[in-house]
């Protein structure tokens, strides 16, 4: 379960693009002398971004793609770019660890990609609290998802890249569009 951010809400209308590649994200990897690993985090993404949006934006919508005609706002498209992991056997600790990198593609009012905000995340889970490797790795991955949510929430209002992007929806910018 993901907590709602306790931050001041942004008033700029935002469209969040939650596409199939995000909601179906599965990391598979074969580790020499360690076996095959499958980490499913895609199914948690919609809940994560619903909570994030509810706590951070006072005016937001969800869409499936940047091509949807209903988008009339700045748009954010999250993408899991990278996932790495370590097991207790590899690190000689009691923890499963997951490192993730999310890219947040930022689109202007004309649906042009203006920039990408990249956020690294880290999560861990104690092996003693989980029944197996898959369960432990998925718990660590969900912890990393909470981490990215926290970083996004805290840094959103202070990140210069975001401030520049939000200015694309200023009244002056909207007037210039006719």
Question: What is each stretch, according to the model?
Answer:
Residues 64-116, 125-128:
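Surface-exposed short loop/turn segments
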Residues 34-43, 90, 130-138:
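Second-shell loop/turn segments in exported
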Residues 44, 48, 97-101, 139, ...:
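A general alpha-helical scaffold signature found inside nucleotide-binding enzyme cores
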Residues 40-66:
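Mid-chain, structured segments of secreted extracytoplasmic proteins
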Residues 1-9, 61, 110-178:
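C-terminal/domain-edge helix-coil "capping" segments
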Residues 1-50, 158-178:
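A structural "domain/chain start" motif
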